[in-house]
Amino acid sequence: MKLLLLLLLPFICVPSFAQTDPPELSSWMINTTGVTGYNGISANIQKVQYSTGNVYINCTGVPSFTIGPWQANPNTAQDQKYVFRIPRSPKIKTGTKTATRLGHIAVWKNGVPIYNPKDAFSYNSLNVWFQDAVLAEAISFDGCYGHPAPGGRYHTHQNPKCLYTLDSSKHSGVLGYSFDGFPIYGPFGYKNSDGTGGITRMKTSYKLRVISDRTTLAGGTTLQPNQYGPTISTTYPLGFYLEDYEFAQSYGDLDVYNGRFAKTPEYPNGIYAYHVTISSTGKSEFPYIMAANYYGEVAEDNFGPGRVTITEPVSTYTPLTFVTPSIGEVATIFELNQNYPNPFNPSTIISYQLPINSFVSLKIYDVLGKEIKTLVNKNQDAGYYKVDFDGSNLQSGVYIVRIEADKTVQEMKITLIK
């Protein structure tokens, strides 16, 4: 029977029985080790809770990487005790789109809020010619392109330099989620929206206007003299104000919201997604992350202090855990370790180690070869991992754990006794 099972497993595919943690749950950097960030504040995501319709992100707003100092900025990062709500089935907003207002409009996967490009200041306070925060506030950014607002609200307006490593050879990963539920990716994606054509840098469709003065808006609107912007100069160079830019259809790869619908590794059937935009040299390019409006229907209870009240039954998400080895210890072999406890009821820990970076597939099958659940299906760095398998919805019996990485397969039996 075992020989027959081993022969059948590579060819078995029963999608209706397969389950995997969706990216809106698995993408978050959950703090499972007590790591702290600035001033000893607990870093990254504290807890992820979810219902059928929403994911709730509990976070401090402080990352685990080093932040600060902030020149010419009297504020310091503080624990914000955020609870953000991310819709799990995002919907396109029909009619008038919702503006990306001042303050947090989205959240990175480590719990740091995302702000739009707009500075709070406009020329002569007339609500036209708004300063571009990336230029106007640049002196106060730390080495990770972030800074704290009044009240200690640390945030970024642009490419989160310290959150990920740029790699132009592969599709960027999910870096965060917008409050309309659509994911935010790094700057690299498939050349074609159907997933073909190789990898390319996603180019913004915004460009600097060809103007010699600031008397009109993009689209041709003529302003009253009292609404004119300052003369273009070294003090106020072209690009210092948001109105210095215009959207040009098909100028780049992305739409007016700075996103597109396309297949991605996490969403193989396609998803609308925003993209971080940078130049060929890595410099942030307008509108940087998201533009003036959201694409989808927004969970507006995220606005204000950012402490959403949960009014529905929720479960707490248990993530796949990277196991920190002892000092000097490195994974030298590919190995699937025996689960613990075994037998188990209802859950057990499955651990494994990777000697090299690999695409990992970790699945559970019943003894007939039917796929029951997908626990892991993504690229992982070399190291030690453990994942919790919950068999609450399964009958007592023997199940097969199968892991495949770097063209190598290992299997083991586990026993559920209720």
State what each model feature region is.
Residues 182, 196-301:
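Extended, compositionally biased non-globular segments
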Residues 1-20:
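Bacterial Sec-dependent N-terminal signal peptides
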Residues 19-135, 142:
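Solvent-exposed N-terminal domain segments of exported/luminal and surface proteins
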Residues 152, 270, 383, 395-398:
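A glycine-anchored, Pro-Gly-centered beta-turn/N-cap motif
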Residues 111, 278-326:
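A recurrent domain-boundary module in secreted/ectodomain proteins
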Residues 99-183, 188-191:
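Extracellular-facing segments of soluble proteins and assemblies that are Gly/Ser/Thr-biased and enriched
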Residues 388, 392, 396-418:
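C-terminal tail/sorting-segment detector
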Residues 324-340, 344-364, 386-389:
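Glycine-centered coil/turn sites that cap beta-strands in beta-rich domains
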